[in-house]
Amino acid sequence: MEMNYCMQCGTKLVMKYHETEGKDIPYCSTCSDYRFLVFNTAVSMVVTNQAEDRILLIKQYGRDRYILVAGYINKGEDAEHAVIREVEEEMNLHVVNVRFNHSHYFAKSNTLMLNYTAIVDSMDVHENDEIDAYRWFSREEAAKNVARHSLAGDFLKGYLTGEYHFSDMEN
């Protein structure tokens, strides 16, 4: 994504060297300020029961593959609240503990994805209409059933092994 005009005043931006960044950054000569690129921020969650021996995976958008629960962070909302909100909205589950796992920038959607563990107090799911299907898996089954070559798969593998490696993925 490229930024050509100042979001404050509309002036065409020029590239100017930024000493601290050590590289050229878009600069507005009218506002006398650098303009850093804007990107989306979202959360994805490894939703587990309290024993952390079961993992909830979902299917969405007519796709026939399991992924993690995820959603965008609203303006003014912190990431941890977004985790709780998304799990409650999509699955009607009460989150009792939130733990940060790892982050990864996903260029395809210009999104910084923040991955968390969301521990819930019940496995009694009441999904909303955004969810096509869901299933609780054992840790081993979850690793086998999550979408291959996906950010969800990479985050889940990292959660299970403690080592995060990201491949070129389709989504």
Over which residues does each language-model region extend?
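Conserved beta-strand segments that form the floor/walls of ligand-binding pockets within enzyme
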Residues: 27, 67, 115
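A generic fold-level signal
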Residues: 1, 40, 50, 108-111, ...
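Short secondary-structure boundary/capping segments
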Residues: 17, 46-47, 58, 125-128
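Residues embedded in well-ordered beta-strands
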Residues: 44-46, 54-56, 115-117
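Short, Lys/Arg-enriched, disordered terminal segments
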Residues: 1-3, 164-171
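Acidic, metal-coordinating catalytic segment for phosphate/diphosphate chemistry
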Residues: 2-45
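Unchanged
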Residues: 73-158, 166, 170
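Conserved Nudix-box catalytic region and its N-terminal flanking loop in Nudix hydrolases
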Residues: 48-89
